[in-house]
């Protein structure tokens, strides 16, 4: 049989978001949204002092193009790693502090990329905006 999902059937899409912070200020937040023409996501984890931020963000188009950027920002600066199957990208010409991996990625969208383990609870939808 067929699985009926009204949000996808009408093209409205679906989204989730979360935001957490512990008593000393360590935090994580993110969102994931998908619809008939693709989707986007973002995740970030950081320490209470602002010394380290680790995260990822990305997008997927309906035609199978996909870009996922993982990053780390610390005392050494901002360093990103870009994974994409987009046409026209040349991995031999990386921008400063960025590594572009022009690898064949799956064309099926399975949701966001998680750069690590998530410990905690998702915040209800009505919790603030990012």
Curated annotation (Swiss-Prot):
Q: Which residues form the Chitin-binding type R&R domain?
A: 24-90
Name the domain of life this protein comes from: Eukaryota
Q: Which PROSITE patterns match?
A: CHIT_BIND_RR_1, CHIT_BIND_RR_2
Q: Which UniProt keywords apply?
A: Cuticle
A single MF term (Gene Ontology) = structural constituent of chitin-based larval cuticle
Q: Which Pfam families match?
A: Chitin_bind_4
Q: Which GO terms describe its cellular component?
A: chitin-based extracellular matrix
| PANTHER family, per database record | CUTICLE PROTEIN (PTHR10380), CUTICULAR PROTEIN 47EF, ISOFORM C-RELATED (PTHR10380:SF173)
Task: Identify this protein by name.
Answer: Cuticle protein 14 isoform a
| UniProt organism field | Limulus polyphemus
């Amino acid at each position: 049989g067929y699985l009926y999902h009204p949000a996808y059937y009408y093209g409205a899409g679906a989204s989730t978001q979360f935001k957490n912070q512990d008593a000393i200020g360590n935090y994580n937040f993110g969102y994931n949204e998908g619809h008939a023409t693709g989707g986007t996501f973002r995740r970030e984890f950081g320490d209470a002092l602002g010394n380290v931020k680790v995260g990822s963000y990305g997008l997927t188009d309906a035609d199978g193009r996909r870009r996922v950027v993982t990053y780390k920002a610390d005392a050494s600066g901002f360093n990103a790693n870009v994974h994409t199957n987009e046409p026209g990208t040349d991995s031999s010409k990386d921008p400063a502090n960025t590594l572009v991996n022009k690898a064949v990625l799956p064309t099926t969208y399975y949701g966001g990329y998680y750069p690590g383990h998530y410990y905690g609870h998702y915040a209800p939808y009505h919790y603030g905006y990012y």
